[in-house]
């Protein structure tokens, strides 16, 4: 990878809390418009990696060096609204509308994610799939050049999962941005990713799925569980968000 195509670089990054090692000697380059999937067991440091990239925590050692300017769109693993806080969908999305997109581009996102009928709804009353679509829209409205999806399938019904898998596949062309996808879904990662990083407090292995599948480190962690198929049931509306 040449320097001109590099969007983000993590160089010899380690993170400790006291004597507890959460991440050690992480070296990652993410290129412009590249999609990178991150997998690993519970406690592997995936959430810590995301926090380091977002700048929420500072490495104990090493450097996280973004290109300038770096605009990150982030869809968190969990999102909760206090019951006493009234927050409409339109209010949440308005926070992301910073005039980086044209009105036509914003409307395209609303249509693609089937959001128009949700705008007056309270966030507290949305289903898991509806909440995920709103959070994805909020991230896209910031016109990111790096989109981070942290366990995007968590808590979704099967129909919404199928739609979101396909939408994620289309996002690089739609957005023209890099993506970092943290996922526990080994089957989707191994079948649908071009570059995978296997994390277990350090980088165990990385590369194309076919390369990881024969890696001894990968086999120790996951065996052949990724071969258990995700059943994709095509339906007429799979190109659009479930209503």
UniProtKB/Swiss-Prot annotation:
Organism lineage string: Bacteria, Pseudomonadati, Pseudomonadota, Gammaproteobacteria, Moraxellales
Chain positions recorded as ATP binding sites: 40-47
Gene: znuC
Residue ranges of domain ABC transporter in the record: 8-225
Signal peptide: none
Species, as recorded: Psychrobacter cryohalolentis (strain ATCC BAA-1226 / DSM 17306 / VKM B-2378 / K5)
Membrane topology: Peripheral membrane protein
Function: Part of the ABC transporter complex ZnuABC involved in zinc import. Responsible for energy coupling to the transport system.
Name this protein carries in UniProt: Zinc import ATP-binding protein ZnuC
Gene3D superfamilies: P-loop containing nucleotide triphosphate hydrolases
Membrane spanning residue stretches: none
Molecular functions (GO terms): ABC-type zinc transporter activity; ATP binding; ATP hydrolysis activity
């Amino acid at each position: 990878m040449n320097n001109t195509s590099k969007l983000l670089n993590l160089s010899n990054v380690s993170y400790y809390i006291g004597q507890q090692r959460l991440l050690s000697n992480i070296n990652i380059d993410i290129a412009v418009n590249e999609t990178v999937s991150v997998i690993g067991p519970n406690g592997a440091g995936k959430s810590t990696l995301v926090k380091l990239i977002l700048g929420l925590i500072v490495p104990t050692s090493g450097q996280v060096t973004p290109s300038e300017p770096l605009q990150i769109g982030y869809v968190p693993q969990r999102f909760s609204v206090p019951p006493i806080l009234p927050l409409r969908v339109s209010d949440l999305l308005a926070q992301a509308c910073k005039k980086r997109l044209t009105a036509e581009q914003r409307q395209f996102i609303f249509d693609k994610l089937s959001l128009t009928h949700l705008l007056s709804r309270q966030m507290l009353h949305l289903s898991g799939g509806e909440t995920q679509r709103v959070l994805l829209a909020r991230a896209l409205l910031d016109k990111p050049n790096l989109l981070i999806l942290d366990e995007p399938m968590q808590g979704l019904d099967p129909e919404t999962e199928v739609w979101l898998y396909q939408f994620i596949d289309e996002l690089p062309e739609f957005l023209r941005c890099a993506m970092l996808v943290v996922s526990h879904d080994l089957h989707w990662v191994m079948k649908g990713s071009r570059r995978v990083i296997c994390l277990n407090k350090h980088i165990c292995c990385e590369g194309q799925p076919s390369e990881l599948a024969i890696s001894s480190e990968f086999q120790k962690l996951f065996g052949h569980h990724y071969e258990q198929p995700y059943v994709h049931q095509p339906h007429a509306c799979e190109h659009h968000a479930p209503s």
